[in-house]
Amino acid sequence: MRRERKNRIGMGILGFVMALALFAAPAAGGEIDDLKAQIKALMERLEALEAREKKMKADMMAAQEAARKKAVATGDFPGSWKMPGSNTSVSFSGYVKLDAIHDFDQDLGDSFFIYDWGGGGSAIALDGGTSEPKTSLHARQTRLRFDSLTPTGAGQLKTRIETDFYGGGNALRMRHAYASLGPVLAGQTWSTIMDENTYADTVDFEGPVGVIAVRRPQVRYSQAMGKNLTMQVALEDPNAPTILTASGTVSSKERMPNLLAALRLSTGWGAINVSGLLGQVRYEAGAVEEDLAITALHLGANIGLGKDTRLWGTFNVGQGGLDKTMLGASAAAVLDANNELEALDSMGGFVGLTHNWSGSLSSGFYYGWVENDFEESAKAAHPSLSQSLQSIHANVWWSPAPKMRVGFEYMHGWRETNGGDEGDAARLQLGLVYSF
C-alpha cells in the first residue's frame, strides 16, 4: 500500500515537471537536470522514511515478544507460578497470627504449657502457691511457607520449607524442610506416628494434653494399598529420649533411628489411622552400659456425625516410646538402683467435638488426659513430675472475611504429681489469623 502511494507521489511530481516542460517556455538543459536531481532526492527520502518505519515496527514486535517470554506463567498447583526459564512451579504462603492471652493463675508461656516434657515438670503451680495472673500478646505463631513442584522422569519432585517464630527470642524456627519424589520423602516433617487429619483445631498453639504433634527428621516410604488406604514406613531421628536417674535426668545415647509404620484410611465420612514406633534407649556412664527397647502405639480418627458435626479422638499407649512425642509423657525410662533401665509406661489421648454453625462460624470442645505409671522408687526420686494430667479447650471460630479467622478459647488444666500434690490453671485466649 505504501509502495503504491510512493509511486503515485513520484508519478505526480514527474507529470507536473513534464507539464511545465510542454507549456512553459523552453528551458535550458541545466534546469531540466536540476529538476531530475530533485526528483531523485525526493524518491530517496521517501524510501528512507519507509525503511525507518519498518524497522521501528520490527523492533516493537521484538520487544513485545521478549516481554511475553519473560512474563510470569501460572504454575502447576494452586497459587503457584513458574520460575522464569524453568519448569519448576513455586509458591509462597502462610499466615500472620496475633495472640492475646490472659492467665488467671500464673504465666504459662506463649502456649498452654501444662504438660511434662523431656523430664521437665508441668508449668501449673501446685495448690497453695502464689497466684500471679498475667496478660500478654505475641505473634510467634506467624508462619512462612515455600513450596515447589518440578516434573521429572521419575515423577513429581516436591519440596517444602516452613518456619514460625518459636525459636529463642522470637527467632525463626524450622518446622518443615523436606523433599519428596514419588513414594519417598526425606527431610523434617510431621512424625509418621501422627496424622494431621486427626489433630485438634485449637486457638492455643499446642492443644490438649495427650495429643501427638511432633516433627522429626526422617526418611519415609509411602505406598497406596487401595483407593483410600495408604501404608507408610519410616526411619526417624529419636530426639534423645529422656532417662530419669536418682539424681536427675540424662539423655539417651543415640545409636540407631526409630522405626515407624502406619496405615491411614481416608474416606468421605472421615479418617482413621493406626501407627506404631520401635526405638531404643541407651545409658552409658563409666562402666555402666544399658540399653532398652521402647515402643508406642497410636490410634486416631475423625468421623462425620451428619453434615456439620464431627467427632475427633486419639488414643496413645507406650512403653517409653511416647517421651518427647505425646504432650504429657514425662520420660522414656528410669535407671533403677541396680543400674538397670526400665521403660516408663504412659498412656493418653483426647476426644473432641466440632460443629459448623454456618459458613463462617464454628465451635469446638476438646478433652485431653495423660497417665504416667512411675515405680515407687521413681516417684520418690521425682516427686514434682506429673502422674496425671487433664485439660479442656472450648473455642469459637469466626471468619468475617476470606482468609481471615478470629478465634476465642477458654482452657483449663489440672495435674497431680508423684508426690500427691495437685494444681490447676485457666486461660483465655483471643487469636487473629490473616492468611496469604
What are these language model-derived features?
Residues 106-110, 166-174, 197-203, 238, ...:
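Outer-membrane beta-barrel translocator domains and adjoining extracellular loop/strand segments
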Residues 156-167, 235-237, 272-280, 362-371, ...:
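Transmembrane beta-strand segments that form the barrel wall of outer-membrane beta-barrel proteins
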Residues 27-109:
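N-terminal periplasmic/intermembrane-space "pro-region" immediately following the signal or transit peptide
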Residues 78-241, 253-271, 302-306, 310-317:
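Outer membrane beta-barrel
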Residues 1-10:
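N-terminal secretory signal peptides that target proteins for export/translocation
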Residues 265-386:
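Detector for outer-membrane/organellar transmembrane beta-barrel domains
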Residues 12-23:
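Bacterial N-terminal signal peptides
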Residues 398-400, 424-436:
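Outer-membrane beta-barrel "beta-signal"
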